[in-house]
Amino acid sequence: MAFAGTTQKCMACDKTVYLVDKLTADNRVYHKACFRCHHCKGTLKLSNYNSFEGVLYCRPHFDQNFKRTGSLEKSFEGTPKIGKPDRPLEGERPAGTKVSNMFGGTREKCVGCDKTVYPIEKVSVNGTLYHKSCFKCTHGGCTISPSNYIAHEGKLYCKHHHIQLIKEKGNLSQLEGGGENAAKDKVVAA
């Protein structure tokens, strides 16, 4: 006897959902693996999801994008807690009326990928913003941190690769504080 599937289709992938992999939320059927946050693609559970117009979100991204509490207490860490004036300041353009402006979020862009940086994934170094995943060594892709990196001519390096590259070029004056490019280097160590 062959195993029979249901006639129900997954709302996310539109493929047949078998009983062993069936998950029902908001009267909609999903595969367990397809039950993911639209924003971060994280796996959801029935106890930790929200939906808006049939689109699934984890609680943090739902709150960030849709929740209007009238209070800034729920804002993500790093989000400015300064209210905007009711009318534009002199010389300032009024806010757009696009539908996208109705939703929360930010217009801050990552210098690594030029995509929007949300407060929960933001790394800020000297006023420059990065995603956590974009804040890495330019040469080797190594993980670096805001407290331990070298910025050289606008690029980020781990200490190991920066020293290696300078040795290959035969010019250590930048590391010792001499030379005309010394002002372009910033070494940060914890």
UniProtKB/Swiss-Prot annotation:
PTM-bearing positions, type N-acetylalanine: 2
One term under GO cellular component: cytoskeleton
Subunit structure: Interacts with F-actin.
Cystine crosslinks: none
Primary location class: cytoplasm
Expression (tissue specificity): Expressed in roots, leaves, stems, flowers and siliques. Not detected in pollen.
Disordered: region residues: 74-98
One function term, GO molecular function aspect: metal ion binding
Subcellular location: Cytoplasm, Cytoskeleton
Species the sequence originates in: Arabidopsis thaliana
Official protein name in the record: LIM domain-containing protein WLIM1
Swiss-Prot/TrEMBL keywords: Acetylation, Actin-binding, Cytoplasm, Cytoskeleton, LIM domain, Metal-binding, Repeat, Zinc
Keyword Nuclease among UniProt keywords: no
Compositionally biased spans, kind Basic and acidic residues: 83-95
Coiled coil: none
Keyword Zinc among record annotations: yes
SMART domains, A to Z: LIM (SM00132)
Function: Binds to actin filaments and promotes cross-linking into thick bundles. Has an actin-stabilizing activity. The actin regulatory activities are not regulated by pH and [Ca(2+)].
